[in-house]
């Protein structure tokens, strides 16, 4: 996959207008042979994706569950251009998720991308997020926003991913589903939903377990999810959401190139240190929506939660003899919460419609961070994988207060102007409580602020063709984890680290063709003060600011469903992400550690392709085939190690039967159909060259579900 897409881009942009003119305009009665009418969530309300002046995709929850295990977002988001989701097969570290290259540096969790679940941020104020609490079994839809307008969501919003829980409808419905597959993998889910008068409800619970394809990669995850909606007499709406997740996962770690070549399923270091992670999280959110009058509305959201994490790492006892070392066991306890108040109004400007949004968001995080040695006994004869002496104790706090506003003005019959601004201010404070000997008081504070403007212009060329251009500025602060360690073995937080600032421009086209939707976008993002790895030794990574980076890209998407229920999907991404300035990692500079200008940013594939064909009637037999290809991915900044590109295929078939009040569904699926051996993801800049996380070989999944409507 090395061909330049430039010629294809020119043909596409020249051909879309002619193709759109050749198709009859869709009518409200059209129905069969067209994609169903859908909307996506924006600050100003629900809008059809075709009318959004930016790159946004929606994946329906039923589609995410169709013929799949229903555990990871990587199973079902392949049809979203610009989104790279890699399953590490390591449930101690979450998925590797990036949007247009933002988030690619993350070695665990999600950074650089803003995540929301039912409107509640799954990204904390410092920019660190996770997807493990998303219950695919109860998801109504997932929406992915890319491009300049994602900056309106504040810090670390190189892209935005939102998941929404379904609302209960009709008479009570009780459902059970189960799926099992290779390597001791299984999932069970139970759900109750419905509505009665002004109240709708959904309660769900699921348990997932796997023995793991690799050695020392077993995991268990329990999720409970609830949603309660109450329509008040005055037309207002109150929604309560609850979510809880617990994860117990072994950490198989990465492999060196030699280890991957000889024994990709082994995890020798992980078994020696018994590396593992335990996570417990519970959160609650309350949303109040009020219609003030015919033109104005008010939305008030408040949420709170707690997350506890304990992680055992593979840091040698010898490295922990430095009196400033924080140990090999991480013990985190976090309390978080926030408020978002938003006012919307439908006004007039020069006798033209003007939609206005103004709001204020406040988010806070309080963290107790402790570090312990991961051994007992002597350095020469240690008992590994147990909690030892305390080596770190601190209380950290992060909070942000962000006012924002957005306006959409229909300035002419075919022209729409949209603009917005957000003032994002993020405050960090650390109170050191481990002051022992040479380990001095490292308390401190930092404050990062930036004004983030965005603007777009949309032209409705025909009823079936829309063109747009957008520009915007975003920024990304370092996370608490990136601030946690300083180079040279010094203790305390790295408050010298600065936020990165990016400027983005995008040109796009959307065309409705033969009942399908074709989207195309060209974009460029220039970033200064990119946050990159400085050192990665002794089990600890430190970070620094590099110079400038540039991301040039092209995305193409196609969604179509015929009248006889054949569904096709295509997503292609070309992304050239490079460092524009040279820097050294680690510092000081030497020939071996100089990152040259022009080097590719690691963790990002230059090209990716997803294609699927499925027969999906509303009842009876259904089947499909999927193909996914990914180009070579660099594993480090100096570009001396990489994971080769690959292409894999999957087949699935199932049967859906509806009988009176019952509904039954069964399926079988084979992934990696041709048993391709490849690297599923890389651990960017891993200090011991253990970059590679192998993907599993050919594997199968079978599942069954049954539901009864009372």
Over which residues does each language-model region extend?
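Membrane-embedded beta-barrel scaffold of Gram-negative outer-membrane proteins
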Residues: 287-289, 297-315, 460, 466-472, ...
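Short acidic/polar hinge/loop motifs at secondary-structure boundaries
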Residues: 104, 112-113, 120-146
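Conserved C-terminal beta-signal and adjacent last beta-strands/turns
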Residues: 231, 243, 469, 505, ...
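Gram-negative outer-membrane beta-barrel transporters
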Residues: 343-345, 413, 522-526, 544-636, ...
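N-terminal periplasmic accessory domains that precede
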Residues: 73, 96-100, 113-117, 130-132, ...
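Surface-exposed extracellular loop regions of Gram-negative outer-membrane beta-barrel proteins
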Residues: 248-262, 366-373, 425-436, 445, ...
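Face-selective signature of the C-terminal outer-membrane beta-barrel domain
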Residues: 237-243, 278-435, 460, 518-522, ...
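Transmembrane beta-barrel wall of Gram-negative outer-membrane proteins
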Residues: 173, 180-209, 214-252, 276-297, ...
